[in-house]
Amino acid sequence: MAKSPANNAAQRVRKKVRKNVSDGIAHVHASFNNTIITITDRQGNALSWASSGGQGFKGSRKSTPFAAQVASEVAGRAAIEQGIKNLDVEIKGPGPGRESSVRALGALGIRITSISDVTPVPHNGCRPQKRRRI
C-alpha cells in the first residue's frame, strides 16, 4: 500500500520572519533585458526582492521603465513591512529601468539617503565580443 501524500514535511509552512531594520541598501541591477531590485540590510542580508519578469512582464516589455517601476514598488512595499525607512541606492548596469526604479522607491515614502552608480567598468580587461552586423 502506498503512503498518502499528506506528509508532515510537505505540510510544514515556513512563517515569514519579520525583521525590524530601519536602514538598508537597494541594489538595482538594470540590464538591457530585465531589472532586478534587491533590498538588503546594512550587512547584506536580503529583506525583499523583485524583478520585472517576476511581475508578469515578458519579452520586450520586461525591459521598459514601467516594468522596473512596478518591480520597485513590489520590493519597496515588502521592505516597508520589514521596517525599512531609509535606503541607500546602488545602481548597476546601463538598462532603461535605472531612473524609474529609484523614483518608485522614493514615491513609496522611503527616504533615499544616497544614490551611487556601481556599474563595473573594465580597466581594459577582457576583449569584447565582435560587433553585431545586421
Curated annotation (Swiss-Prot):
Stretch forming the signal peptide: none
Entry GO CC: ribonucleoprotein complex; ribosome
GO biological process: translation
Molecular function per GO: rRNA binding; structural constituent of ribosome
Alphabetical UniProt keywords: Ribonucleoprotein, Ribosomal protein, RNA-binding, rRNA-binding
NCBIfam families in the cross-refs: PRK05309.1, uS11_bact
Alphabetical list of HAMAP family matching this protein: Ribosomal_uS11
Assembly, per entry: Part of the 30S ribosomal subunit. Interacts with proteins S7 and S18. Binds to IF-3.
Protein known as: Small ribosomal subunit protein uS11
Gene transcribed to yield this protein: rpsK
